[in-house]
Amino acid sequence: MKKTTKMFVMAALLMAGSQIHAQEEHQYVDLGLPSGTLWATCNVGANSPEEAGDYFAWGETTPKEKYYWTTYKYSYNGAESAFTKYCTDGRYGDGRHGYNGFYDNLIVLQAGDDAATVTWGNEWCTPTKEQWDELKSNTTSSRTTQNGISGRLYTSKKNGSSIFLPLAGYRWDRWENKLEGVGYNAQYWSSTLNDKDSSMAWAYIITSAEWKVKSINRSSGVSVRPVRSAK
């Protein structure tokens, strides 16, 4: 991000009442959350809060052309129900077993499989399901636009600081290689696997009607908004 761009972004957010902090080249907001979690102002791959950034399958650390089971890193031979990592059930069963009886009971992304950590450094990670729940419980949410981009603004109930999540859409290319739902919905990964169905991982879903934590297909191309711990 260029210096002038950084100054513009910081000024805009400060005007909105947020206390912006810089950590090397990545900025974050203290929302006064009980856990002390600090939320980044931008998505991975973005240069401003309203920019979509990159899309990632769950547990993958680089964007790609096609998001489906046939291209998913941890799917055995393109199967949607046979996994080589992050699996809680080795028995045969739709969408919840490892290849050839494999299971590892890993339910949280390891650092080397976390797009936020690999891209931004060890102090950053993808939020857990619990951190998304905490954000939703401790902020108010409103539909808004920022520099012409639709999204939701999450404002702290404690200190009035806020973060903007753009409606960046998502990728899942079973039939066509295209981006879905830009300006209407968004999906943001958590680092937490659905331990009842290993084909799914938890994500924060934003639509015109709702915003909640929900499990989705882990081969989908989804946004990542990093978090870090307070120093």
Predicted segments, located by residue:
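Bacterial Sec-dependent N-terminal signal peptides
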Residues: M1-Q23
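Conserved positions within compact, well-structured domain cores
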Residues: Q23-K231
